[in-house]
């Protein structure tokens, strides 16, 4: 995923501020060395408790896929495996999540909103 690093990870919490197509968000940098400000490609993971119907809900119509300023994510469902692992597609990125609970009726291409998470980013191809 292409992002613009606005502020490097200076503190022990390794929080960086990034700009995406959808706005500015604070995320956790997981690279070995702090990133330099500027445009870069990253991979991301979503961390936190994920439950269908609580943290993973249908997105309102008209939403665009991507990282939101509030730290949530909107993504298109790319598939759900028999073990419950869901593949979510955002511009330039596919993220795997394993929400618990009863899966609502969703289809490939439907948008979901994932809230109450922390987003970790890594340098691409690490």
Regions found by a protein language model. Name each.
Residues 13-58:
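Acidic (E/D-rich), amphipathic helical modules within compact regulatory domains
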